[in-house]
Amino acid sequence: MNPSEMQRKAPPRRRRHRNRAPLTHKMNKMVTSEEQMKLPSTKKAEPPTWAQLKKLTQLATKYLENTKVTQTPESMLLAALMIVSMVVSLPMPAGAAAANYTNWAYVPFPPLIRAVTWMDNPIEVYVNDSVWVPGPIDDRCPAKPEEEGMMINISIGYRYPICLGRAPGCLMPAVQNWLVEVPIVSPICRFTYHMVSGMSLRPRVNYLQDFSYQRSLKFRPKGKPCPKEIPKESKNTEVLVWEECVANSAVILQNNEFGTIIDWTPQGQFYHNCSGQTQSCPSAQVSPAVDSDLTESLDKHKHKKLQSFYPWEWGEKGISTPRPKIISPVSGPEHPELWRLTVASHHIRIWSGNQTLETRDRKPFYTVDLNSSLTLPLQSCVKPPYMLVVGNIVIKPDSQTITCENCRLLTCIDSTFNWQHRILLVRAREGVWIPVSMDRPWEASPSIHILTEVLKGVLNRSKRFIFTLIAVIMGLIAVTATAAVAGVALHSSVQSVNFVNDGQKNSTRLWNSQSSIDQKLANQINDLRQTVIWMGDRLMSLEHRFQLQCDWNTSDFCITPQIYNESEHHWDMVRRHLQGREDNLTLDISKLKEQIFEASKAHLNLVPGTEAIAGVADGLANLNPVTWVKTIGSTTIINLILILVCLFCLLLVCRCTQQLRRDSDHRERAMMTMAVLSKRKGGNVGKSKRDQIVTVSV
């Protein structure tokens, strides 16, 4: 290529170099591990709980039912997405964090206990030997031996509590005897006896004293009268048949400020039969010496001998267990289970003997001779929700408080029990009413005004809503995965139960004796009975939940729409309710329930259903640009004029852009020509006119 051709060739376009140092510096600072800046309102989110997932599923199902949409995984996901997006996108109003809303809440099965009262129904007390102690049998107690005897300090309220022991307000223990006659014919031996001695409940008033109200039909229970003769049994001392009966008169077990407790079961003891006696006969009541002799410690005496010139008779025939009940100031049911706890506190002793007739000083002489070589240890147990508090229990009637320091929580009583302590029957609380505070108003679910606020935020911050929506979708995938895993686990647990049931059926083949099978069936029946009792409490709690309208963001307990009024229910009343007190200063639960149920009914019509979904649809329709145009002009002519104006403006912008681009090209060519001319050393000298023209025209 010659120099002339090089001169004719246009020089290359020079690029405009920018200063890239600041951009490079910024790129060097960018790292993927850098944390995002947290805004002042940002809060650390906790992982979703199972209760929140369950509540989210319930709300999504409810919305689909109200809108009559088929429940498919896709529709459930979209419904859950809508709910989560509404909650996430809701702007926090100014001053909302400082607001305080206090409502009544129902907490089912809190970690609290209360004393079992005389007005409660009898509880289930299980024994390990139903031959000598009647009642349901269960030889697997205690269920958790490692938890027996845990220390506890209690201070709870009461209203006629059930307590056993040597303390005011508790039923006192004593030894009681039950006698049966063995049919043996002998000229010397009048009667042959089998007797059982064990711990029972001590009468405070002699049962032979005639009280007018004792014979009143108002307090006499309905039942079979006790026999007039001593029950006759077989010679087998290993069998004792218990039969409930009602004695001719009642005994008073307690009559003080804690109430009047009576018992209509027979209280058998030996006494002198003075009928037909011409000489001076001792009192028909039990001899103090005899009573003292028979009620001494069951461990010291293994031989009893009663001698007299008068015949010995056994009063109050019948083999029946005590069934105490309260009759004043309130009336309650019978509680036969208390005796099963008392009799298990000491082993029972089995006696065998007879009554012989001799002649001394030409007079008949009667001797009762009893011997014992057999004792049987017993065990009585309760099952949840019931427990036994054992220790130095103090009942304070002035403050209606039961206190016990360093007490033990037990479920079983056996022969190692020390009667220097007392026994208080307690159970888990079914539920309590407490005021709770929230940082927002009570809502049954994300309501219409929340949807409206969200839609306003969508219209004003569209880009922010898109990013929020993406984040919500990603979060909801994790939530859905968690729920799916939980569903699989639940399904697996059901299969495990079936597997256990199959194994349980197969395990019955390993039982080799009918007694073992009977014991297993008895245990299963007892488990079923206790389960029914426990399920009854659960059903009562569910009944309350169904009748109440609860806040949408709670599932473990129920926050009701009833506002807490401190002037009407001060905190001291709530505290006494939590302690289990039932006096005039305690919270009136029945009245409070009526108010809360009425408030729940008033909010039933405010639950957002189809109206809420319609509001969402209307709000989303506002995102259509056509609706924005319609808001400016409502006629077609005006809309057409607006469109023409927009097109004219667009055309004007395009023409201006093209003109600016042509001017820029002309300037750039002129600059290139000047650059070429300035680089020539000799200018145009020696060049022909044609070359000059060619060079310039390039």
UniProtKB/Swiss-Prot annotation:
Question: Which segments show compositional bias classed as Basic residues?
Answer: 10-20
Show the segment(s) annotated as Disordered. 1-47
**DNA damage listed as a keyword:** no
Additional record remark:
This envelope protein is encoded by a human specific provirus.
Name the Gene Ontology molecular function terms of this record.
structural molecule activity
UniProt keywords (A-Z) are: Cell membrane, Cleavage on pair of basic residues, Disulfide bond, ERV, Glycoprotein, Membrane, Signal, Transmembrane, Transmembrane helix, Transposable element, Viral envelope protein, Virion
Stretches in topological domain Extracellular: 90-631
Please state what the protein is called. Answer: Endogenous retrovirus group K member 9 Env polyprotein
Q: Which residues are glycosylated?
A: N100, N128, N153, N273, N354, N371, N460, N506, N553, N565, N584
Organism equals: Homo sapiens
UniProt superkingdom: Eukaryota
Specify where the region named Fusion peptide lies, as residue ranges. Answer: 465-485
* Function of the molecule: Retroviral envelope proteins mediate receptor recognition and membrane fusion during early infection. Endogenous envelope proteins may have kept, lost or modified their original function during evolution. This endogenous envelope protein has lost its original fusogenic properties. SU mediates receptor recognition.
Swiss-Prot/TrEMBL site (Cleavage) positions: R464, F465
> Per the record, what is one GO cellular component?
plasma membrane
Q: How is it modified after translation?
A: Specific enzymatic cleavages in vivo yield the mature SU and TM proteins.
Transmembrane segment boundaries:
632-652
Q: Which residues lie on this side of the membrane: Cytoplasmic?
A: 653-698
Give yes or no: UniProt keyword Signal.
yes
Q: Provide the leader sequence positions.
A: 1-89
Q: Describe the subunit structure.
A: The surface (SU) and transmembrane (TM) proteins form a heterodimer. SU and TM are attached by noncovalent interactions or by a labile interchain disulfide bond.
